[in-house]
Amino acid sequence: MQLFFIDTTPLVDEYHEEPSEYPDVQLQDTVKQLSWLREELSKSKADFKIVIGHHPIYVSEKKRSDEPGLIRKLDPILRKYKVNIYIAGHSHTFQHLTKKDSPVNYVVNASGSLGREPIKGPDTKFCSGEEGFSVVSVGKDVLKMTFINYKGIPIYQFEIKL
């Protein structure tokens, strides 16, 4: 398994629309970051590749929806290099989404507070507004991800097999 952590903030269109409110975003080199990600993913020999960023690419919730900047700039890279899971937060919900034309499992991890109300969309495998956390376990030929609510109760699990 190999983990790749990226800063998604400068890839979000909304932050570029208000430069005075988000001045640091304008200074970040997104071309360099995405080039690094492409290079590292292309060299990876890992059975399981997980990319982790703060903002979800795809999300179904009352206050948020899919992020166009990430769909344009990040998602094609994840698909090309057959990333198994993209894990994000920001939305304060549990979500597991898949796209018919993508090998990527898109996961939104919940939070310890301020749960929000997700909306089950056509690509949603699971969603919940409960607070909680996720656990990833990796074996020789299987990766399991479990969503656990704030009471410590597993509420959803999925597997990816080689």
Where are the language model's segments positioned?
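Metal-dependent phosphoester/phosphodiester hydrolase catalytic core
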Residues: 1-120, 125-127, 135-162
